[in-house]
Amino acid sequence: MRLSQFHLHTTKETPADAELVSHRLMLRAGMIRKLASGLYTWSPLGLRVLRKVEAIVREEMNRAGAVEVLFPTIQPRELWDATGRWEKFGGQLLKIKDRKEQEFCYSPTAEEAAAEFARQEINSYKQLPLNFYQIQTKFRDEIRPRFGVMRAREFLMKDAYSFHLTDEDMAREYDNMRAAYTRIFTRLGLDFRAVQADSGAIGGDASQEFHVIADSGEDSLAFSTGSDYAANVETASAAPPAPRAAASEAMQQVATPTQKTCEDVAQLLGIALQRTVKSVAVMTQAGFVLVLVRGDHAVNEIKLAKVPGLADYRLANESEIREHLGCEPGFLGPVNTARPVRVVADRDVAALADFVVGANVSGAHLVGVNWGRDLPEPETVADVRNVVEGERAADGGELRLARGIEVGHVFQLGSQYAQALQATVIDEGGKAAVMKMGCYGIGISRIVAAAIEQNHDDAGIIWPAPMAPWQVVVCVINPKQDPQVLAAAQALLDQLLAAGLDAALDDRGLRPGAMFADMELLGIPHRVVVSERGLAAGTFEYRARTADAAESLDKAALFSRLGH
């Protein structure tokens, strides 16, 4: 391919609203152009990258035994009413009417369509298991589309839906898909982690996310140095605490007139922050609850909501706090409460001895507090906190925290969607059985942006080789002035293509500096320059995208450097 015959339009200017590096570089490289808020046209260059990602995803899904289908993007309201998601999905669901006033939605995901297809097509357990996947445009009506294709309203997604007779078979396919996803992201050349996750609005029992590691990631991840353990901070856990030590201090009240935070109290008393206890007051349908975490820890809202009776909790207001504890916020504690309250203690708090809590008296705290002596053992002990960088993991390693961009998610859905849409089969006993479902998504267009967030420098994109628009670009100096140089460059291009390399010829006639800057901006892994001087010496100028300088190589050395 000659770039003079290819639409390539790079720019130096970046719109002011392009916040992320990937958004800026994709615009500057001419990969995308904005059509409307959250809607982007993919240029020929951008589409080359997108199709390369799509091809690897398709190959690995086929290898894993899934079969490709294509569901409609426009889906009838009846299906979404059956599962309750017509209302539950909220404002992100784009709802439309046809000329007959019948209601439809623009599919943000396709569990309903897949379950309906399975109901129509599968009637016997002998046909199971089956895994259908599609690569299809989706639409979610984001309130504030931002970050380019990272959070666009319209995006390209691979979504798969598997159907099973038993939970055990569903779990086997879940593992099969996790392995396929690992192969996909490995082949794409990305630094990623598969993490335990919360199932969120889609639901289900087991859930795992795949994140590309990047400083700009919206999600906070924790992973261990001792194994492949990794989890979203929503679900991550550290090693359990050591057994509680024996009490060694007497409880006494101390004045803390202006110290309302654990940090200030610890500094005043000259003690470690880990010995203080933070009291968080919440309200549930059942009443007032006091949640306790160590002063150096933070409550994890997702974990707390999973504690029995706290699914609907909210923070208590000041009047509710005064009613139950008899004091103002800043001095709260579980000792001497005005009314009986339920106490939920993080397991690290339950393991403390001689700790410090608010005295439920304005301007005072209690020191030397101990469970079983100064207050009852906590009614509920659970892991309800965020993990901390460097603490011990359950496998003995250290926990490390990183930011991640979610690019894939796998779920074990169970029977909720199949039950709602009456997707049943005849089982071995001749009875109707509701099928079990798994669902598995990959954000194909999001992968492109995530790869750039992870791989770039001041000059531009640094593509992992499998994703680059071309592996090699042959650059010609003064192609119009020297036909021999152009002919030699074309001959080299033909040899590169014959060797199986995805290569292009830059014959646009740009100044060398501008041409080389474009190649760096576009993230081309290998740049080869053909010039009159080089031909006279029998060499080519070669530079890898990440190299500090160019080098002169003869043809044999060049092909060796390119892995051929």
Curated annotation (Swiss-Prot):
<dbReference type="InterPro" id="IPR023717">
    <property type="entry name" value="Pro-tRNA-Synthase_IIa_type1"/>
</dbReference>
<keyword id="KW-0436">Ligase</keyword>
<dbReference type="InterPro" id="IPR036621">
    <property type="entry name" value="Anticodon-bd_dom_sf"/>
</dbReference>
<dbReference type="GO" id="GO:0005829">
    <property type="term" value="C:cytosol"/>
</dbReference>
<dbReference type="InterPro" id="IPR045864">
    <property type="entry name" value="aa-tRNA-synth_II/BPL/LPL"/>
</dbReference>
<dbReference type="InterPro" id="IPR033730">
    <property type="entry name" value="ProRS_core_prok"/>
</dbReference>
<dbReference type="GO" id="GO:0004827">
    <property type="term" value="F:proline-tRNA ligase activity"/>
</dbReference>
<dbReference type="Pfam" id="PF03129">
    <property type="entry name" value="HGTP_anticodon"/>
</dbReference>
<dbReference type="InterPro" id="IPR006195">
    <property type="entry name" value="aa-tRNA-synth_II"/>
</dbReference>
<dbReference type="InterPro" id="IPR002316">
    <property type="entry name" value="Pro-tRNA-ligase_IIa"/>
</dbReference>
<dbReference type="GO" id="GO:0006433">
    <property type="term" value="P:prolyl-tRNA aminoacylation"/>
</dbReference>
<dbReference type="InterPro" id="IPR036754">
    <property type="entry name" value="YbaK/aa-tRNA-synt-asso_dom_sf"/>
</dbReference>
<dbReference type="InterPro" id="IPR004154">
    <property type="entry name" value="Anticodon-bd"/>
</dbReference>
<protein>
    <recommendedName>
        <fullName>Proline--tRNA ligase</fullName>
        <ecNumber>6.1.1.15</ecNumber>
    </recommendedName>
</protein>
<dbReference type="InterPro" id="IPR007214">
    <property type="entry name" value="YbaK/aa-tRNA-synth-assoc-dom"/>
</dbReference>
<dbReference type="GO" id="GO:0002161">
    <property type="term" value="F:aminoacyl-tRNA deacylase activity"/>
</dbReference>
<keyword id="KW-0648">Protein biosynthesis</keyword>
<dbReference type="InterPro" id="IPR002314">
    <property type="entry name" value="aa-tRNA-synt_IIb"/>
</dbReference>
<comment type="similarity">
    <text>Belongs to the class-II aminoacyl-tRNA synthetase family. ProS type 1 subfamily.</text>
</comment>
<keyword id="KW-0030">Aminoacyl-tRNA synthetase</keyword>
<dbReference type="InterPro" id="IPR004500">
    <property type="entry name" value="Pro-tRNA-synth_IIa_bac-type"/>
</dbReference>
<keyword id="KW-0963">Cytoplasm</keyword>
<keyword id="KW-0547">Nucleotide-binding</keyword>
<comment type="function">
    <text>Catalyzes the attachment of proline to tRNA(Pro) in a two-step reaction: proline is first activated by ATP to form Pro-AMP and then transferred to the acceptor end of tRNA(Pro). As ProRS can inadvertently accommodate and process non-cognate amino acids such as alanine and cysteine, to avoid such errors it has two additional distinct editing activities against alanine. One activity is designated as 'pretransfer' editing and involves the tRNA(Pro)-independent hydrolysis of activated Ala-AMP.</text>
</comment>
<dbReference type="Pfam" id="PF04073">
    <property type="entry name" value="tRNA_edit"/>
</dbReference>
<dbReference type="GO" id="GO:0005524">
    <property type="term" value="F:ATP binding"/>
</dbReference>
<keyword id="KW-0067">ATP-binding</keyword>
<comment type="subunit">
    <text>Homodimer.</text>
</comment>
<dbReference type="InterPro" id="IPR050062">
    <property type="entry name" value="Pro-tRNA_synthetase"/>
</dbReference>
<dbReference type="Pfam" id="PF00587">
    <property type="entry name" value="tRNA-synt_2b"/>
</dbReference>
